[in-house]
């Protein structure tokens, strides 16, 4: 055994020994707690809170608090946490992940660390994969926490801001990861402190932590606003792609065949036009060169149409519902994701392909990755039955250790080696034969599929075989709880995509474990192909054999499965040829085949990890910028102090930039240069009568800066006099700063998003895209800060203040990728109207509209014309 593996095993043993000792100490309180009356046990909560207030740490209280919660669970829920569950709870309190097998009672395990950490009063967030589980767990476990005197809240997408605030103010809050992330983003877009809902992030306990922190981490959370509509171009590009000759991803056997108009890279799932395809495109769109700079936008539409038509598969990647809406199917759970949309125009391209109404494109206004959101918590932990395969990722990205926890009872499930068939047809025939055999014995069967399409194919074959069954996929997920509840009954046959009831127990019915033959005892799990992630396969197996129950699992594979096509089918085919195995019904069991499949899965997992890492690397670049902007917004919203000192700094830096810019462009002794500077100052800072050419002529650069700054201070004082009330002055200052910061920040992150889409091409020039992105984003950030300060100065100086009128400022219409909701933020009761003059603006001056662009590249185009 290599030293590194031996060391890891020894570390696990040491950790388990330590946890075992701590769990015994918790159990030593059992008799004392059992003899307490209900009132005495409930009184332990305020007593423990008082001890925390006097300086004791949560670690000091762990043994007693766990024992209190354990005894309360016995009285309220009728459940008493086992020794191994106490061990798991200690790992969770330490901010790590206990790997506990399916059915080992993770929900009950979580109650002890949740109770202990909630005693601090700083808030605990229990995070689930969907709202159904959040509601269920809050209802079931909330009874325990309420009995112990703690408050429990539920945060759902449908809740109003007031209801959300109430939920977050509870000791314990149940929510989904997406809703937590979106609430954080929304809190940093409001204009009043009272509109914020979240408290500082303290402790998050994530259920199915691998699903949330790993699988969902590839998709950033985005709040967006509407951008320009380009429906006609999407339809035109779609018409073009439908004239092309080639293969779809699901039937492709090689990347490219002679005469094809496009080629597909099966491993990376990317697509590009061949020379023949490019010729067709140039004729179709009547252009000379598809890849000319002036055709960049068209190329973008064509690339999306290619992906939509030949890479994105109906009922696998997405489905169309009865409202003619394209819904994404989560590849890891099989559930649809209402409200989420593919970015960068791909979703619109799919809508064009399916001939359904095309929704407007969106513009990013705020975004954060799952990784960077959860890394903001002071303490983060989670539970799952399948995390060891992603141990490196948890350690590197979240600084979390994985500790395997022993099962309470030995696992009795029989896990058979994979069976490999040459064709899909042969594989499905074997699957149906196995189902018939097991169904005849009354054994409950769960058939796991990767895609909706496969589940419907098997359902059709079972109908032909006259075997009654239930189908659980993205099209009828609303019946999930009911279907899973009956899946363990004698003779039940259930077909399910990967969603197969994560977090829900398949309880075995009467007589299911009594069969004389071990092969037919308990739930039989049949996998119809390997998923690209070993964790998903392990989760499917884990549906059977829960809590020491008997069970059996068997995977059926074919050389035509997608995973086999992408990685390794040629090698396996060659192996079969050498073994002289042929024929439709030929089947092989081999350790070599299993190792080859696991090797393929590791490669896919490696690719997916790299993809998530890259998403994080890009988000890390703007993380510091986001934190600075959000922190400054918070200061502006929460401050009770006059912001004049802050504004004076902005005015001074803006004046310095203007004078320095004109000095670089020309000589300050030159009359034309001074005239240009005067025009800029009069257009953006001061009334014409406040400063004259003669005052600036002959001055040095520093003297000009000092003179203009003195006059700006006087102008500012007169503006503030119109708002005699200090409170209204602060409202006005706050309204201007927030409006300018929000406009510029949303423009900035949208520009960064667009740059990220294109910066990858710089790799062809031997440049590191991440480094290029860092450098460009830093320059853009500095430009944004300059634009913010310029625009704040302009608005403060030029705004026509109407002191008697109070008009609420409303935020723009926005959309989240998970909720498609409108968010209206109400701002200060201050009216700001502005009169912008484009007269006498120098060509190279900043445009008075506040875009940050030069006048000649903005409003100057139309004004000069």
From Swiss-Prot:
Keywords: ATP-binding, Cell membrane, Cytoplasm, Membrane, Metal-binding, Nucleotide-binding, Protein transport, Translocase, Translocation, Transport, Zinc. It comes from Lactococcus lactis subsp. cremoris (strain MG1363). Its main location: membrane. One of its GO terms (molecular function) is ATP binding. Belongs to the SecA family. May bind 1 zinc ion per subunit. GO terms for cellular component: cell envelope Sec protein transport complex; cytosol; plasma membrane. Gene3D superfamilies: Helical scaffold and wing domains of SecA, P-loop containing nucleotide triphosphate hydrolases, SecA, preprotein cross-linking domain. Monomer and homodimer. Part of the essential Sec protein translocation apparatus which comprises SecA, SecYEG and auxiliary proteins SecDF. Other proteins may also be involved. This is Protein translocase subunit SecA. PROSITE patterns: SECA, SECA_MOTOR_DEAD. It is a peripheral membrane protein. ATP binds at residues 85, 103-107, 505. GO terms for biological process: intracellular protein transmembrane transport; protein import; protein targeting; protein transport by the Sec complex. Its EC number is 7.4.2.8. HAMAP family: SecA. It is found in: Cell membrane; Cytoplasm. Its cofactor is Zn(2+). The keyword Metal-binding applies. It catalyses: ATP + H2O + cellular proteinSide 1 = ADP + phosphate + cellular proteinSide 2. Part of the Sec protein translocase complex. Interacts with the SecYEG preprotein conducting channel. Has a central role in coupling the hydrolysis of ATP to the transfer of proteins into and across the cell membrane, serving as an ATP-driven molecular motor driving the stepwise translocation of polypeptide chains across the membrane. InterPro entries: Helicase_ATP-bd, Helicase_C-like, P-loop_NTPase, SEC_C_motif, SecA, SecA_CS, SecA_DEAD, SecA_motor_DEAD. Zn(2+) binds at residues 847, 849, 858-859.
């Amino acid at each position: 055994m290599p030293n590194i593996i031996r060391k890891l095993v020894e570390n696990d043993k040491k950790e388990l020994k330590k946890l075992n000792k701590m769990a015994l100490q918790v159990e030593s309180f059992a008799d004392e707690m059992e003899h307490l009356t209900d009132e005495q046990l409930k009184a332990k909560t305020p007593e423990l809170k008082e001890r925390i207030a006097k300086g004791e740490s949560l670690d000091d209280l762990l043994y007693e608090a766990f024992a209190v919660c354990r005894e309360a669970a016995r009285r309220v829920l009728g459940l008493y946490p086992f020794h191994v569950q106490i061990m798991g709870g200690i790992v969770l309190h330490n901010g790590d992940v206990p790997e506990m097998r399916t059915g080992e009672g993770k929900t009950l395990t979580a109650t002890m660390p949740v109770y202990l950490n909630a005693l601090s009063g700083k808030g605990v967030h229990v995070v689930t994969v969907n709202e159904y589980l959040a509601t269920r767990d809050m209802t079931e476990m909330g009874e325990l926490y309420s009995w112990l005197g703690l408050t429990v809240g539920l945060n759902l997408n449908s809740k109003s801001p007031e209801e959300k605030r109430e939920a977050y103010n509870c000791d314990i809050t149940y929510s989904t990861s997406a809703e937590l992330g979106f609430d954080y983003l929304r809190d940093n877009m409001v204009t009043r402190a009272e509109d914020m809902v979240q408290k500082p992030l303290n402790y998050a306990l994530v259920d199915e932590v691998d699903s949330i922190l790993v699988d969902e981490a590839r998709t950033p959370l985005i709040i967006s606003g509407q951008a320009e509509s380009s429906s006609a171009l999407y339809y035109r590009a779609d018409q073009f792609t439908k004239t092309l000759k080639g293969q779809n991803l699901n039937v492709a056997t090689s990347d490219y065949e002679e005469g094809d108009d496009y080629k597909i890279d099966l491993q990376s799932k990317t697509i590009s036009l061949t020379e023949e395809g490019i010729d067709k495109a140039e004729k179709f769109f009547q252009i000379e060169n598809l890849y000319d700079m002036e055709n960049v936008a068209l190329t973008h539409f064509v690339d999306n149409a290619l992906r939509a038509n030949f890479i994105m598969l109906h009922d696998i990647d997405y489905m169309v519902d009865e409202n003619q809406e394209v819904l994404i199917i989560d590849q890891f759970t099989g559930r649809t994701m209402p409200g989420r949309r593919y970015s960068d125009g791909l979703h619109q391209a799919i809508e064009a392909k399916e001939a359904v109404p095309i929704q407007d494109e969106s513009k990013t206004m705020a975004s954060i990755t799952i990784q960077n959101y959860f890394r903001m918590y002071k303490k983060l932990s989670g539970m799952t039955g399948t995390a060891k395969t992603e141990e490196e990722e948890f350690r590197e990205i979240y600084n979390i250790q994985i500790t395997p926890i022993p099962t309470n009872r030995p696992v009795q499930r029989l896990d058979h080696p994979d069976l490999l068939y040459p064709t899909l047809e042969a594989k499905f025939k074997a699957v149906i034969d196995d189902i018939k055999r097991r169904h005849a014995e009354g054994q409950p069967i769960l058939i796991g599929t990767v895609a909706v399409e496969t589940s419907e194919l098997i359902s059709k074959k079972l109908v032909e075989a006259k075997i009654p069954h239930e189908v659980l996929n993205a099209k009828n997920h609303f019946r999930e709880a009911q279907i899973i509840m009956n899946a363990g009954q004698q003779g039940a046959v259930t077909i399910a995509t990967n969603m197969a009831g994560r977090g829900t127990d398949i309880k075995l019915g009467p007589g299911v474990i009594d069969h004389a033959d071990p092969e037919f005892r308990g739930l039989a799990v049949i996998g119809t192909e390997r998923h690209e992630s070993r964790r998903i396969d392990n989760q499917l197996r884990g549906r059977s054999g829960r809590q020491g129950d008997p069970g059996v699992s068997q995977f059926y594979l074919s050389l035509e499965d997608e995973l086999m096509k992408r990685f390794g089918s040629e090698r396996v085919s060659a192996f079969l040829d050498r073994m002289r195995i042929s024929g439709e019904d030929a089947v092989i069991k081999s350790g070599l085949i299993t190792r080859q499949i696991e090797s393929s899965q590791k490669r896919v997992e490696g690719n997916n990890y790299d993809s998530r890492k890259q998403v994080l690397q890009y988000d890390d670049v703007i993380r510091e910028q986001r934190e600075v902007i959000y922190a400054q917004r918070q200061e502006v919203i929460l401050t009770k102090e006059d912001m004049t000192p802050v504004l004076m700094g902005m005015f001074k830096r803006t004046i310095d930039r203007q004078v320095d810019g004109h000095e670089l462009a020309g000589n300050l002794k030159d009359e034309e240069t001074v005239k240009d500077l005067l025009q800029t100052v009069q257009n953006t800072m001061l009334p014409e009568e406040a400063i004259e050419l003669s005052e600036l002529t002959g001055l040095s650069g520093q003297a000009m800066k000092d003179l203009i700054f003195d006059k700006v201070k006087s102008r500012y004082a007169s503006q503030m006099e119109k708002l005699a009330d200090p409170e209204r002055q602060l409202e006005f200052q706050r309204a201007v700063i927030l409006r300018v910061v929000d406009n510029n920040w949303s423009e900035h992150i949208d520009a960064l998003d667009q740059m990220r889409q294109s910066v990858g091409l710089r790799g062809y020039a031997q440049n590191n895209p991440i480094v290029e992105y860092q450098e460009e984003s830093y320059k853009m950030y500095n430009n944004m800060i300059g634009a913010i300060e310029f625009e704040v100065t302009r608005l403060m100086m030029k705004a026509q203040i109407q002191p008697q009128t109070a008009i609420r400022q409303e935020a723009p219409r926005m959309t989240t990728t998970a909720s498609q909701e409108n968010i209206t933020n109400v701002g200060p009761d201050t009216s700001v109207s502005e009169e912008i003059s484009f007269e006498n603006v120098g060509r190279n001056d900043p445009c008075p509209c506040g875009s940050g662009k030069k006048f000649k590249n903005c409003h100057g185009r139309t004004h000069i014309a």
